A protein has these predicted regions:
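A structural feature that tracks compact, well-ordered secondary-structure segments
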Residues: 8-9, 31-34, 39-63, 69-71, ...
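Intrinsically disordered, low-complexity acidic Ser/Thr-rich regulatory segments
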Residues: 108-127
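Generic long, charged, amphipathic alpha-helical segments
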Residues: 149-172
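Internal, charge-rich low-complexity segments
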Residues: 76-109
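Active-site-adjacent structural elements in folded domains
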Residues: 24-28, 36, 79, 109-113, ...
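Hydrophobic core positions in small helical hairpin nucleic-acid-binding modules
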Residues: 22, 99-103, 219
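Beta-propeller and closely related beta-pinwheel folds
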Residues: 13-36, 151-159
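Single conserved hydrophobic/aromatic residue that forms the stacking wall/gate
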Residues: 1-7, 12
Length: 224
């Protein structure tokens, strides 16, 4: 479930308040700040994702509400991350033309037609990391805006090789990230230098080589 609250509701005293009413078996996985024109992106452990406008969220009158459905989950699936994206109103045809032109220009924005320059300048990227150390980086334009509560689209192809998704986060190509495994190993790397941009339906590339019984448990974008 997902809950929208106005900022005035977040005046919390030192004893705390219930922010959202959780059903049995449910848990809170994240809290983000958004503005009216943002989109919300949810990602699941089985490689599904949904993107919808914040205007689709009803503002609740107070803390402690149960929220509304963000994505329809399969029986064995669960949401693992949430992030905000810039809202865009581009058509599917324009989006596809831009992504094709960018691929042909081999990521060199200076070679892209002038009509696509604004899209290039506002482009965002989504990085998905799996438990077996794989990373998949895609343009946020790959994810169309849909209605809240649907089943979503494929965010990453999940296989026994790459494992289930542990997190999807918004990044820039020049960002550094840190991955940590359940054995305490840590890897720091640059996004653009180590993970190439691919289409939405891909299993990604190996970023962190884990041992047979080792799993990645957390990833974070590092501040400069």
């Amino acid at each position: 479930m997902i809950l929208g609250l106005v900022g005035s509701e977040m005046c919390i005293r030192d004893r705390g308040k219930t922010a959202i009413k959780l059903k049995t078996g449910d848990r809170l996985i994240g809290v983000i700040s958004v503005i009216e024109n943002d989109d919300v992106q949810l990602a699941t452990t089985n490689g599904k994702s949904i993107r919808f406008a914040t205007k689709d969220l009803r503002e609740f009158s107070g803390l402690g509400s149960a929220g509304v459905r963000g994505i329809k989950l399969a029986k064995d699936d669960k949401v693992v991350s949430v992030c905000s994206l810039l809202h865009n109103k581009i058509s599917i045809d324009v989006r596809e033309s831009y992504l094709k032109a960018k691929n042909e220009a081999k990521k060199d924005i200076s070679k892209i037609n002038n009509k696509f320059k604004e899209l290039a300048n506002t482009e965002e990227y989504l990085l998905s990391i799996t438990e077996n150390g794989y990373g998949k980086l895609s343009s946020a334009y790959e994810y169309r805006i849909t209605n809240r509560g649907g089943s979503g689209v494929t965010n990453i192809t999940v296989t026994p090789k790459n494992g289930r998704v542990i997190q999807s986060l918004k990044v820039n190509l020049d960002d550094n990230i840190a991955l940590i495994s359940d054995t305490g190993k840590l890897l720091r790397c640059n996004v653009g230098d180590n993970i190439r941009v691919v289409g939405r339906v891909s299993q990604g590339v190996s970023v962190f080589k884990v041992d047979a019984n080792e799993k990645i448990v957390s990833v974070a974008r590092l501040e400069d």
